[in-house]
């Protein structure tokens, strides 16, 4: 899955690294040329770890069966819930519970890690 007319995001669900491989997040983030980029880095049991390099806003969505964890590496991430906005700085994380309408925004280029179930659809249900 990559950018399309409905969702102009670069989303790569292929797993980039296997066990016993070094993952260089900084090199991947520095090489990113997109405003909204999501790359699956590795699989850990039934979950995946994804790198997001983001600027702008994602659409409102929810995941009916899956929680979603966001962790900021660099920049600031805003997570909008229906009546609340969470602001995350580097080294801060937040879990959005399953079934919760949300969207993420970044006013500046921001690098994040996401941990979610292997089969999750990133754009929501």
Predicted regions and their residues:
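Short, conserved beta-strand element in jelly-roll/cupin
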Residues: 53-54, 63-80, 115
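Conserved short histidine dyad/triad with adjacent acidic residue
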Residues: 34-35, 48-64
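A cytosolic small-molecule/anion-sensing beta-strand core signal
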Residues: 45, 73-74, 89-90, 108, ...
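A short, N-terminal "cap"/entry segment at the start of jelly-roll beta-barrel domains
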Residues: 1-50
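Ligand-binding loop in jelly-roll beta-barrel domains
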Residues: 98-125
């Amino acid at each position: 899955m990559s950018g399309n007319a409905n969702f102009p995001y670069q989303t790569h669900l292929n797993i980039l690294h296997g066990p016993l491989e070094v993952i260089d997040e900084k090199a991947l983030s520095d090489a990113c040329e997109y405003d909204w980029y999501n790359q699956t880095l590795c699989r850990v049991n039934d979950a995946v770890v994804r790198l997001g390099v983001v600027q702008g806003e994602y659409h409102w969505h929810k995941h009916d069966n899956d929680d979603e964890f966001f962790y900021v590496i660099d920049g600031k991430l805003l997570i909008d819930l229906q009546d609340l906005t969470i602001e995350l700085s580097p080294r801060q994380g937040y879990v959005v519970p399953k079934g919760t309408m949300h969207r993420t925004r970044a006013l500046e280029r921001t690098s994040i890690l996401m941990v979610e179930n292997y089969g999750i659809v990133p754009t929501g249900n």
